[in-house]
Amino acid sequence: MIFNAADAASWRRAGGLIYKPGPEQWAADLAGIAGGVTDLIVFGEGGPYNRAVLSQVEALAARVWVLENGYFRPDWITVERNGVNGSSGLPRFRGAYAAPALPPPVVQPVGRILPHHVANISLYHIAEALGAAAFPNFVVHYPHSPLKQCIGHVRRYLGLAFRPRRTRDAEQIAARGPFFIVCLQREGDMQLLRYSQYADNSAFMAATLDSFARHAPGDCRLVVKNHPLDPGVVSLRRITRWLAMERGVADRVDFIDGGHLNELCRASRGMVVNNSSAALSALGFHTPVKVLGDAFFDFEGLTDQKPLDRFWSEPTPPDEALFHRFRAHVIAASQINGNYHEPRTQPLAAEGLADMFERADG
């Protein structure tokens, strides 16, 4: 389906169906369009077009698949039936993962994907903006315009390239005292909008800092890590600094852009997330995790189930054996080795997806 100029520029084969009516008409036309295909595939759960598909899952004759970035990154992508993340069909209790772990799959590392990801996102937004007149009924579901996001991505990526690495090194941070890490998500991320009591990163940070200021040990610091793909339209660094000052803990709170997540997980006392999949990396390093939103991995044995106020002084690490069984099950059920943006591993991802669809036919 081609809904905008960026879709048209990206689709280089015959057979693309150009659709120019708005999302309300799309919802009405969907059943007829889906009647001629076996499978409908959407990327993510955001936007009125994808939401129309997901709201009609039970009524559609075609199977519905949802693609998303990998739960275990960077070497995997996610594909599930009917929903991902908070709508995932994966079990949410430890008893479902009691069976011995499956043998680990052979994985082809995807390498460094951030430059490719930023370039693809930026080019897509540019094409969408330049061709907007040709698709007047297309509705952008992002909280900020595509052009603003494009400029923000490029500016932020260039800034990271020239910023001293030492300000983001786990060793440098740990030398200042024990710390907890908070992982932010992209502004406007569907996980924030659909699967959280907090409307945005600012509300999530306010609640986290309220608890940290009142209940964390006085020698502990809080390291707030920005999402690597946040477009930088909202200055989360400035907001974090203001929230910390307002609560009297500015001298114990650091904001970092970039940094090696694995090293930070190893060095930290624990991680707090809204529902970011960064938590899965932390769990793999036996790092205690507290989830404040709705996540398929938030259950007893994996994440800390105590209130946040107690987490600061009594962080509980995951059951290591349970995590290995959980990871093996999730990879077998929903993960495909490869990447959407790294050119060398795109064919690998495509082959894996085709194989999963064929297995579903069997």
What annotation goes with each model-predicted range?
Residues 38-39, 179, 221, 270:
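Structural motif
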Residues 135-239:
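Conserved catalytic-core segment of nucleotide-activated headgroup transferases in glycan assembly
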Residues 39-54, 257-303:
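A donor-sugar binding/catalytic signature common to diverse glycosyltransferases
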Residues 65-159:
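Active-site-proximal region of nucleotide-activated glycan assembly enzymes
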Residues 3-97:
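Active-site and donor-binding regions of nucleotide-sugar-utilizing enzymes
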Residues 90-133, 301-362:
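Leloir-type glycosyltransferase catalytic cores
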Residues 21-35, 228, 233-278, 284:
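Donor nucleotide-activated moiety binding/catalytic core segment of transferases
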Residues 59-64, 220, 286-287:
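A short helix->loop->beta-strand "cap" motif at the edges of active sites that frequently abuts
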